[in-house]
Amino acid sequence: TTGVGLPLDGPSGNVPTPHPAGSPNGYQPPYVAPELVTRDYGPISTMDPWLPANATRTEGNNTFAYIDVARPNGFGTGDVAPTPNGDPDGGIAFDRVYDPLQNPYANDSQRMAAATQLFYDINFLHDWYYDRGFDERSGNAQTSNLGRGGIENDPINAEGQDNSGR
């Protein structure tokens, strides 16, 4: 991440992708070790939290991020939603590390890491665009608009590894 928490392009940071030559030549970008980002909300003037205090999975006011590996489409039996795995300060932590050397479908640890990153990215972008004018009245996706107008109950269902075939 950068100083404001802006997500990096990928596990290689913001180096040229896919590679500087623009054609296959054996270039391998350097791996950037992940860091645990601690924040309750992104770059947003309202300081609305991403998760309720009693959160049990990556589901908040703006998005529900999960891995949709089982039919039917949408979250259900067999799908994976990251659960908190502790925080030494007593808050909520989703401390998941994605291993780029493993298959993304290898195990639930890989899936939880991917969905945790998806949750972070969606929430960060929600907050980033909010203060640039994409608020409730403009159609910003939220479960509760907190009395600020617009249509409620329209959070983003962010499905990683979506099984719908699209």
Predicted regions and their residues:
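Extracellular zinc-dependent metalloprotease catalytic-domain scaffold
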Residues: T1-R166
